[in-house]
Amino acid sequence: MATATNNSTLFPDVISFNAVINAWAKSNEAFAVSRAEAILQRMYEIDKSGFPGVKPNVHTYSTVLDCLAKSRSKDAAIRAEALLEVMLERYNAGDIHVMPNTISFNIVINAFAKSRDRDAAVIPAAKFCYTAKHSILQFTNIGLDQQSRFASRY
C-alpha cells in the first residue's frame, strides 16, 4: 500500500484499530481479551505520543467490552464494569468521544446477566439512568423480576 501511494509513513487510524479489536472479539480465542485490552492501551500510548487519529472512542471501548462479555472468564462482568467506569471517568474528565452509550451499558448489563449475578446488573443499569436514556433492552437483560426492584430504588 505504501508503494502504491509513494508514502512510506502510512499508519493505521482509530477505524483500523477498531477493526482489529472487533476481529479479536469475534475470534473466541482464549487470549482475545488480553489482545483487545493491549490494543486499547497501545492506542492511548500512540495518541499521547502526538500521533493524530488513533485516540480510542466509544466504539473502541464498546468493542473491548463486547470481547470481555463474550469471554468465558469468570470475572468478565466485573472487568467489563471496571472498563465502563474508565469510560465514565474519561468522559467526566472532558473526553466527549468516550461517553458510554446504550450499547456500552447493554453489553455490561448482559455480561452480568450471563454471570448469573443479576443483582449486580442493577448497578450499571442505575449508572445508565444518569448518563443516557434507558431502553427496554436494559430491563430485559436484567430480568423482569429485577425491573420492579430497580424502579422502586430510583
Predicted segments with their positions:
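Hydrophobic packing position at a conserved site in alpha-helical tandem repeat units
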Residues: 1-6, 36-50, 80-94, 127-135, ...
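Alpha-solenoid ARM/HEAT helical repeat scaffolds used for protein-protein interactions
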Residues: 6-8, 27, 49-52, 71, ...
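Short coil/turn connectors between adjacent alpha-helices in alpha-solenoid helical repeat scaffolds
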Residues: 23-35, 68-80, 113-125
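Intrinsic disorder
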Residues: 104-105, 135-139, 144, 148-151
